[in-house]
Amino acid sequence: PGVYREQINQNNTIVSQNEQSLSYTVCDLNTGDARGVYKNLNADLRQYKRIKMFVHAERYKNQPLADGEMVAFVRLGSDLSENFYQVELPLQVTPAGAYLADAIWPTQNRFDIPMDALTQIKAKGINSGNLANLTYYDAALNLISSPSITPHVAGQNRYAIKGNPSLADIQVIMVGVKNATSNQVCG
């Protein structure tokens, strides 16, 4: 929705960049459990102001799935366990039979990550001396003291940081979903 392929001029030729996508199904995801895919790379993200990504969620084989039961996340850092930023977004489920772009790709499912939010939560973590633990912040960058019982807000990012990640040295990115309910989910 509203995305156009980036064009790069090379040797008097205009080359269109490839559009990338990923589709996967997750079933029997237990409470608080997460699954994702990752890509190793070497990237310096300091030159970017925002990262945007469109996410779609749907029921799988008529199994029940309600809005907010699955949460999409993007984790980026020098590793996936000790030094990373994480951004989460609760997912709105696309109704069966939807064919309009805005129904398939609802606004609430669009990651729009301001890079300065990541630098601000890192500064807060340094000031509080709490970078060793996974620490969560809401969309207004206020500390969430009990993330497991604080509900996600539709259409709003939830940020997290652990360790000492650097936007200048991103070596791995993970994209996935986690179960935000007390039941198993599938989607």
Model-predicted regions and their roles:
Residues 1-187:
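Extracellular/surface-associated beta-sandwich interaction domains
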